[in-house]
């Protein structure tokens, strides 16, 4: 049946039995397709009936359907004509793992960062009103913990003050990656446990109003009493007191019930909250039995067992996790903070070992940062573990609440640089540019697991300001030994005998191994290369000035945007020191990159061993910088 669904209109003629069959078919499709490519499986298994109902009630794209935390949009993609492309999910030139404006007119926003859909909805509804579009509803599907983010409540405050037709669907599965925490989560849990008193009261209203003479008076008295009891006992008052209509809670796996609730909400023609209770991983035993994450995201797996088909090597996240636990065992002042991602950021083991020193603040990076500032003021040393891309959300708090007060807070930035399959919104290519302008900030970029352990230990010893440790996604690889350490800077390679100090390569973090390989290629071209790892890359160590002055060309290699990264900082440091050495950088262009593997993206932008070696050869030739004016081949193949 799924093959016959080319668009939402094809759902309108289906019977209830056919809808149930289609839901089962969609789940089976999701399990087998996502098992083959990797992706967000659990969240999408939980929204099958909800998404079917949305597309039967609303006229997409005339009525925009916005998915907060857009990893919930796989079923939406299937129902809008893209099921045939799921073999390419998250692959280069294939389907995005998130809504994508370039894919379909049904995708309004490139949504993947949480808590933003309601603000989009507020703006769209205002625009439709100003443009005279009277019969357009805006639907925002908010779930997977997004309502723990403060931006949602800022938007709700504005939406509630209007009469614009915004339908807010709360997909309540009690989770983000892990179980959702906080007061709001407890409110939703209370709503789930309520009996269907609204239905009973409605029957009572009809009966009382039917009594001759005194019926209306009795009804009004009953209504007043009911309102008082409801305000005292019902958690949904957090919505209704804002002026929002509330419908629910609804069984999110009963398509007919969800559809009825959505039609009811649509008829309000005003802001309304529809509370839908779903189960993440619904219908797939391996996901339902995954207590920690309900298979929120997975790599390539066996669809029958849910087990990974290959075992990855030791990863950066695991190395961080182990090291933090070792440090915390020695230091009672070390505490850990996550923004709803204990598993992905490596803090699950810390939570089990030190539950009283672990804080999951929900999807609230801004609060995480200022809460960390408070902890530091109180004598603790907070370690805030975030994906690099989510640091962007907490910049003001980092700058004004942490750095201005010179507080010892350590930020650990996982998924720095190019992450790949999750696309533009998840690349961590801005962190060095952001961190580099923060006064007093010290940034480490470990090249391997040994340096990660070393630099994290150094970071938590800093008492007079914030620190950050950044590393990429994936396997950590082999340790890369240093030839020597000069004033804190590790020297990884030096010119071969008989070659001059032609080029200084400053390798940032995980690009160290590639930089050493580049040096070997250039040696064969007669170019003498020194490769160094600054370890603490920002601010630029003083030893870099000394090393640069002894070479004819300085090249930085980094997986940050070229503007404002380590390359920019090195150039500025040399100018201030009046060291007149040409500087070049091999860095990411200032662009948003489509989803593809990390290797594919780096190859596309020229950050490979061969391309960098060829670039340096050309720069050296142009500068005439080789010893004795030797002729340098343009080819390093």
From Swiss-Prot:
The lineage of its organism: Bacteria, Bacillati, Actinomycetota, Actinomycetes, Mycobacteriales. Binds 1 Mg(2+) ion per subunit. Binds 1 thiamine pyrophosphate per subunit. The keyword Nuclease does not apply. HAMAP family: DXP_synth (MF_00315). One of its GO terms (biological process) is 1-deoxy-D-xylulose 5-phosphate biosynthetic process. Mg(2+) binds at residues 144, 173. Pathway: Metabolic intermediate biosynthesis; 1-deoxy-D-xylulose 5-phosphate biosynthesis; 1-deoxy-D-xylulose 5-phosphate from D-glyceraldehyde 3-phosphate and pyruvate: step 1/1. Keywords: Isoprene biosynthesis, Magnesium, Metal-binding, Thiamine biosynthesis, Thiamine pyrophosphate, Transferase. It catalyses: D-glyceraldehyde 3-phosphate + pyruvate + H(+) = 1-deoxy-D-xylulose 5-phosphate + CO2. It comes from Mycolicibacterium gilvum (strain PYR-GCK) (Mycobacterium gilvum (strain PYR-GCK)). Belongs to the transketolase family. DXPS subfamily. Coiled coil: none annotated. Its cofactor is Mg(2+); thiamine diphosphate. Catalyzes the acyloin condensation reaction between C atoms 2 and 3 of pyruvate and glyceraldehyde 3-phosphate to yield 1-deoxy-D-xylulose-5-phosphate (DXP). GO terms for cellular component: cytosol. CDD domains: TPP_DXS, TPP_PYR_DXS_TK_like. Pfam families: DXP_synthase_N (PF13292), Transket_pyr (PF02779), Transketolase_C (PF02780). This is 1-deoxy-D-xylulose-5-phosphate synthase. Disulfide bonds: none annotated. GO terms for molecular function: 1-deoxy-D-xylulose-5-phosphate synthase activity; magnesium ion binding; thiamine pyrophosphate binding. Its EC number is 2.2.1.7. Homodimer.
